[in-house]
Amino acid sequence: MSSTAENQRVNFASIKNQFPYPDFLEVQLKSFQDFLQLDTPPEKRKKEGLYKVFAENFPIADTRNNFVLEFLDYYIDPPRYCIDECIARGLTYSVPLKAKLKLYCTDPDHEDFDTVIQDVYLGPIPYMTDRGTFVINGAERVVVSQLHRSPGVFFGQSTHANGTKLYSARIIPFKGSWIEFATDINNVMYAYIDRKKKLPVTTLLRAIGFESDRDILEIFNLAEEVKVTKANLKKFIGRKLAARVLKTWVEDFVDEDTGEVVSIERNDVIIDRESVLDSDNIEAILDSGTQNILLHREDQNLSDYAIIYNTLQKDPSNSEKEAVLYIYRQLRNAEPADEASAREVITNLFFSEKRYDLGEVGRYRINKKLGLTTSADVKVLTKEDIIEIIKYLIELINSKAIVDDIDHLSNRRVRTVGEQLYNQFGIGLARMSRTVRERMNVRDNEVFTPIDLINAKTISSVVNSFFGTNALSQFMDQTNPLAEITHKRRLSALGPGGLSRERAGFEVRDVHYTHYGRLCPIETPEGPNIGLISSLCVYAKINDLGFISTPYRKVADGKVDFSEEGLQYYTAEEEEELTIAQGNAPLDDNGKFIRDKVKARFEADFPVVPPSEIDLMDVAPQQIASIAASLIPFLEHDDANRALMGSNMMRQAVPLLRTDAPIVGTGIEAQVARDSRTQIMAEREGEVVFVDATCIKIKYDRTEDEEFVSFEDAVKTYNIPKWRKTNQSTTVDLKPTCHRGQRVKAGDILTEGYSTQKGELALGRNVKVAYMPWKGYNYEDAIVLNERMVREDFFTSVHVDEYILEVRETKRGMEELTSDIPNVSEEATKDLDERGIVRVGARIEPGDILIGKITPKGESDPSPEEKLLRAIFGDKAGDVKDASLKATPSLRGVVIETALFSKAVKKRKSRLTDKAILPKLDEEYEEKMASLKTLLVDKLLVLTNGKVSQGVKDYMNTEIIAKGAKFTRKSLEELDYNSIQVSKWTADAQKNELIKQVILNYLKKYKELDAELRRKKFDLTIGDELPTGIVQMAKVYIAKKRKIQVGDKMAGRHGNKGIVSKIVRQEDMPFLEDGTPVDICLNPLGVPSRMNLGQIFEAVLGWAGRELDVKFATPIFDGATLDDLNEWTDKAGIPRYGKSYLYDGGTGERFDQPATVGVTYFLKLGHMVDDKMHARSIGPYSLITQQPLGGKAQFGGQRFGEMEVWALEAFGAAHVLQEILTIKSDDVVGRSKAYEAIVKGDPMPQPGIPESLNVLLHELRGLGLSFTLD
């Protein structure tokens, strides 16, 4: 048990120096960094991600190979808008992608064509924020990693209806055709290409070069060759033939079209396979002119290879040519033009690098499975692969090998963001290269450049459709920091190329032993997606091949290696055959196991073994669970089903106005808060120089060299988000926790708020709870709350809604924002400003106008009255209608922010003033650029002082400053630093590094200034960037402060959820002997059947913590024991197990039995009654059936369904039933008559015919059946 200074938690973990958690967002951030490789110099980039896409698609040449477009390098420019601006304006946070391309001519006829190197704009790439998200059209989205079947070879088994076992081998590539080898009930092996046509496997073998029966049998060493002589053959009478005896002859015929004589080779079967050699056959063999025959080997176990003989019997082909033509006919259902084209089709299927790609993973898996040593660079199938797969299948049939477990994590891999983007860019660039080729072919003799060839929209349209419509690009769950971090670490088996809910069976959803330490067995959704969507465990990482690995410590001779080398990450495959000890197995100070028998894990078994047999040891007991499950204290005492609900409900906890970290935590809370990146953190050592509610300024320490090479100010400003709306309408509101003059170091958290307190995750509040019934109000999991919770804002949260109104240009004219709305009282528009937008601070009630807008009406002939009004008041009076945005029926709140974005619709006069401003902007920019370059040259002169050039070159490898020349101000000023090579300027390596850094920093600053100028020009000439067709966009943000109320859903961390049923005055709540009233009464019957005892442990320890003002960390599976609880309750002077007598708040009498009392952490969930309460009197109707719509969003009605009708029928309430089915629903005439009758006070009319009956009659008439109603 230890106490850490950082967060002052008493830790019950048995392991003192715990292995640190990896960065929880690494799965997203690293994948995207590896995709772009921006921090890597171009010459050192690995062939992966975006670089690999370019390498695969370039160079591009025209059909005659005259012109070649070559790829040199790619880079990105700074984004036009920052993240916050993109969210506010509804834009995508993206960076411009540019490529340096080289176009040259190889044709001597075009000598005048100069080689062109150009920077070409390829469109915007959505750029990942430092929080691992993408901002797409103003909304934060997450690209979820996909768990899919790994490329490679898979061996499976199925059972035919007649009980025969059928075996199959399927080769799955990254790109290209699938091929499957399968047996049938007749013990014949077939090959299926792309799940279409089947052909005997021997036909495929012939087509790939094993032409004769002899070649095929030799692969499996099944036949012996006998020279044909009479004496020789007589020795082998009674032996079986292994191959057909063929007579080959040539047939000549005249081609009718050309008149030429054409010869065709023919094969006649003289004796079939499996025939027994006898004296009659000998004569036939001698007559055929065959040189050699094949006989079955006598020493081979022929039954093992019976399938090969059976397949040869079914094989319709006798030579390579026949096999190739047969396969072509099967695949294409047509005759091939010639043998060469048929052969090309087969080569393209599996042996062409352009058409077929196993990928690095596929090759690795095939080599591993079949024990091959083929080079990792060979990404296509080889003959050896196919033969080895057939041999393995034969072993399977003979029960000498085992089938693959498809759910084993060695057979499933993860497609991370980077890989998914690689696939999308691959599609985009392939399309682009097609258009480039076409343009090259068309522009044969013209002078053209790379820019003329490339259409930037091709790539961006593919990438945008991926982010906008792909099932794995999801709207981020942003309810609280835990929800965010979990969403980014989620793995989905669904999506394109994955499973579908309907087809996924029980096995694929189930927990597998290889999930240990990789996929959480607890955290998965309830419902149709159970088991298909899972979460990464806390220590899990995804390796370069996409397999999930988990860390273990090595153990040798019963001693655990605690050194850095002793810790290693293992994939599911590497872990096979190893015995692994649990993370909390007792060890002595030397790392040796104390006990002579150790609980261990070996694949799916849990043996108890001596220490000498242990190979590895878990790094920590919490290795098995995900972040959310690791946040549940005493998880080991909860039933798994309830733990699943607990971990899922913590993601739904709304951030509260007043945050409060849990008294009983698990020790992972600080890491979650830090790695979620929702707080502002110091980047390095420095000093806080300014703090207020909206920003923090830090002056970072810099070394002399850093100071010298930098073009930036040493002080960095961080803006603090205030009441910022999240995707789920909860709020991010941070407040600073640092002060002026404070020294900070890298990773220090400087703010709190948004479910975070003092650098720890704080999703709910610590409240005093009693497990006792209270007047029946906590029946069936309902919760009784103390009024103090409402009064003191314990569970108060703030929710912000965004309301948008767009102004468009219509056919009838321009819409307009205004507070001058026709036929609306002054009272209704009192809070609108001159632009028609409600003022900040206004209180909003249902029906209030938020944004005033008028839109032109359709022209009709005005009446005399209208003519008069127009004559008096001008043209405005009658030709516009009110199109304002009004508050919905349930909306109440306060306006906290408004925004108006407009495109620059300019009059001639303002355009003239803009013309005058633009040159000034250019001048200002030129001055800034000049002073920046002067500063650069000054720095370079200091660095190159007294040094001579080693030959400074540009991208074309032309020497600009000659080798041996001295650096002068003039030579340095004349350089174009955008096209310069920054390495090896001088002979001093240290100075070279500084020169490189100075130039790179200069270019970064140069690009920033350039982007700033473009932005200013854009704002001036075009205005705000808005979607097409929209002239203005007004936004209003309304905050709602929601106290806890009856009907809200609350939950603990152990799956103990309930609805608030009554809020009781403080004086009426049950109280303890010292007069303390409890905050919450929970039903004790909610515990035994749910088996989530963790809540009781938490309550007792929480009470001790509150009394002693101590916070605890009890890590899962390694936390506080019952003895520890008793020790702390005794210290706190409270009853053991929390058993206390309570007194009735109403009468003051003591209850008969003691109840369990404690302090538990409770959350308020996002399911609030305010969002669900709804009532309808009249509202919209469905167009076809004329029945009321459903749902709160549509202002719909309550469905009176089949069972409700039965209930009224059972009571005999005929009139009520008729009314509900007619005038309250879809009797159109009846409902207007009923309304009229109610208004006039007349008796109710007779109901008419429901519209849905008319719909049915129309449908029947559509079928040609005529009906009339009498």
Swiss-Prot record:
Its EC number is 2.7.7.6. Keywords: DNA-directed RNA polymerase, Nucleotidyltransferase, Transcription, Transferase. One of its GO terms (cellular component) is DNA-directed RNA polymerase complex. It is an enzyme of class 2 (transferase). InterPro entries: Aspartic_peptidase_AS, DNA-dir_RNA_pol_bsu_ext_1_sf, DNA-dir_RNA_pol_bsu_external_1, DNA-dir_RNA_pol_su2, DNA-dir_RNAP_su2_dom, DNA-dir_RNAP_su2_hyb_sf, RNA_pol_bsu_bac, RNA_pol_bsu_CS. GO terms for molecular function: aspartic-type endopeptidase activity; DNA binding; DNA-directed RNA polymerase activity; ribonucleoside binding. It catalyses: RNA(n) + a ribonucleoside 5'-triphosphate = RNA(n+1) + diphosphate. GO terms for biological process: DNA-templated transcription; proteolysis. DNA-dependent RNA polymerase catalyzes the transcription of DNA into RNA using the four ribonucleoside triphosphates as substrates. The RNAP catalytic core consists of 2 alpha, 1 beta, 1 beta' and 1 omega subunit. When a sigma factor is associated with the core the holoenzyme is formed, which can initiate transcription. HAMAP family: RNApol_bact_RpoB. Belongs to the RNA polymerase beta chain family. NCBIfam families: PRK00405.1, rpoB. This is DNA-directed RNA polymerase subunit beta.
